Every structure is written in C-alpha cells, then in structure tokens.
Amino acid sequence: MLVARERKYCSVCHQLGDGYHFGAIACKACAAFFRRTTSMNLAPKFVCRKKNECVIKMSSRDSCKSCRYAKCLHVGMNPEVVQAIQQAAKQANSPGIESLPSCSSSPASCNSPILSLELGDYDQMTPTLCGVMESYQKLYKKRYDLHAPKLTPRATNYGEFCKIYSNDVYLQFEFLEGSFPQFKEMGGFEKKHVFKYFFVSFLILEMGYRSYQEGTDAIVLANGDFIDTMNLDEFYYDPESLEKCKPTDAMKMYRPNFDQMKRNVFQPLSHQKLSLIEFLALVSLCTWNESLDGQPDCYYPSCRPVRQSVIADLKAFYEKDSPDVDPAYRLSGLLMLLPALERSVELFLQTMEVKRLFRCFPFHDKIYKIIDGQ
C-alpha cells in the first residue's frame, strides 16, 4: 500500500519543500540559491535596500538576495556542506565548469525557481503578467523535456548555438501565443512580422536575465549551456574550416557586439536586480511597442492597452508584495532599460546581415527566415 508522504514547507520561502538540503527543509529553488551563493562566494556582493528586514516569501524571494541568504543561514543551512560536496567532487575528478559553477546539473535544476513557482499569489494581483508567467513555465518545462539528458552545462560553440535556437524558436512561438491572446488571434502573415522582433529582443533579454540569475559573466543560453565571452576563440571554433573567415577575424569583428550587449543590457539588468515578474514585464513591454516600424496594422491598436495593463500589474505587485518600494522609482528604472535594448536589437539585426553577406559565421537558414518574416 502506498503511503502519502507528508509535505513540509520550505524553511526559507514557505512554499512546499523538497526535503532536507544542506541542513534544513527547503524547496529546490532555495536550495539551488544557497548552493550557488555559497560556492561562488556571492554573499559579500549582496546589498539590502530595506535595512536587512525584508520578508522572504515565495512571491518575493528573488527581490532581496541578501536577506534571502541570511534567512538560509538562520534556518540552519550550512555552507560547510556545500564546500564539502565541492571538495569531494574535485577529489573524484568529476567534470566541472569553472566559468559557470552555479549550474551543476540539468537545465531543470538551474531553473527550478521557475519550474516550482506557484502562481496562485499572482492570479488576482497581476492577471496579465500571471498569464505570461504561466506560459513561461510551460516554455521551461518543454525545454527540460528537450534538454534533460544533458546533465552538465558547458561552453558552447557557434554551430551549437545555432542548433539550440533553431529548435527553441518553435517553443518561443508557443510561449508568445500562450502569453497574449492579441497575438494568437492574428493571421499567419501578421504573426511572422510580430514574432521577428520578439525573437531577437527575447533572445537578448533572456540571456541577460539568466546570466544575472546565475551570477556569471558568461552568457547563459536556453538549454543551460553558455557562451564563454572571455574565450571567444572557443565559441568561434571551426575545426573543419567551413566558414569563409577565420575564427580570429570573427572574434575581432563580433567582440564589440558582445561588449555592447553586456554594457547596455546585461549590466543594467543586473544593477536593477530584476525579479522574475519584472523580467517578464520587460518582455511584454518590448513585444508591444507602438514605436516600432514595419508591423502589421492589427498590431498597433493592442500596444497601448497591453502596456497599460502590464504597468498596472507591476504597480499592484509593488504595493502588495513590496510596500516599501516606491513604484514610480522602480518603474522608471525598468523603462529606462528599453531604449538600450532597442539599440541592441537593431545592432543584432545589422550584424546578422553582415554575417550573411560575408559568410562569416552566419546563422542557420531557419533563423534567417524567421528574422526575414518568412
């Protein structure tokens, strides 16, 4: 006879726990956060904006890493256990990824805060963004099904990058349809034009957000692998000489693009300390941008209502979940990120044309067709 296991709550954020982790009952999300923070010695970099008095709960656990880590220690999570596991792994000569030590298992483990998120707290408070979060959860679960056999993230090369996003593009399309009924109701021709800009802006935003979440300078990709921007010669590795330009030339040509993306998007995202709901709000605001040229006529009437709904959701979220946060100040910080993101998207699109023109590490044909709205 099967006996139902008693589910205890996470000692840190109070969602359903996953058992004992490092000395205390915790969910997968808080266990991963504690392991990552301890192994990378990130705690000294954390700063609380509220005099170290933040209330840590499921819906706001990402808002203050300093107080979250302090609570992990308070409830009994032991850093020495993390260090002992690391030392044992080194002695066993197990493969490790020094550039991205925060991810040590499958993509699902790296992204467990999203996969384990309960949406009940958000449904009435942020109805529009709740729908986007639910769709984003589905995207992550589908990615897990696609990439689960790979247990350890690693530095990827250019060819693998193209394959990853040639497969992921279909999942992103489903994510956009599931997030916004305005998009789902469009015709096929109109959807292609809207998705073109969404694909690039979402690609850049998500890479920046995931890299911030992992606390790494590497660029984290959809499947959990990463681009080691400190060693771009490995990214542009071309052992069979299939490309018309040398890897060294590609590094010189494209490194300014990586630097621009980090400076204008990734670093501001990290400075803003985005929560998940804020990241998805940025995705929504970028998707429905009435200042974009070349979109179908049916697109523009939806932009302002969607944006107003997203901003209203954020305001409600701040007032209920973070009463000490000035909504106007926080919102202005988010909106200031948008112009730099738009410039990065334009540069990305221009670079794609250069790649194709000179056949210097061009993207997969499938990606070009998407960008061209075919």
UniProtKB/Swiss-Prot annotation:
GO terms under cellular component: nucleus
Localization in the cell: Nucleus
Zinc fingers typed NR C4-type, residue spans: 10-30, 48-67
SUPFAM superfamilies: Glucocorticoid receptor-like (DNA-binding domain) (SSF57716), Nuclear receptor ligand-binding domain (SSF48508)
Domain NR LBD: 124-374
InterPro entries reported in the protein's UniProt record: HNF4-like_DBD, NHR-like_dom_sf, Nucl_hrmn_rcpt_lig-bd, Znf_hrmn_rcpt, Znf_NHR/GATA
Gene3D superfamilies: Erythroid Transcription Factor GATA-1, subunit A, Retinoid X Receptor
Key words, A-Z: DNA-binding, Metal-binding, Nucleus, Receptor, Transcription, Transcription regulation, Zinc, Zinc-finger
Single GO molecular function: DNA-binding transcription factor activity
BP-aspect Gene Ontology terms: innate immune response; regulation of transcription by RNA polymerase II; response to hypoxia
Presence of the UniProt keyword Transcription in the record: yes
Pfam families: Hormone_recep, zf-C4
DNA-binding region: 7-84
Family: Belongs to the nuclear hormone receptor family.
Function: Orphan nuclear receptor.
Protein name (database record): Nuclear hormone receptor family member nhr-57
Organism this protein belongs to: Caenorhabditis elegans
Gene: nhr-57
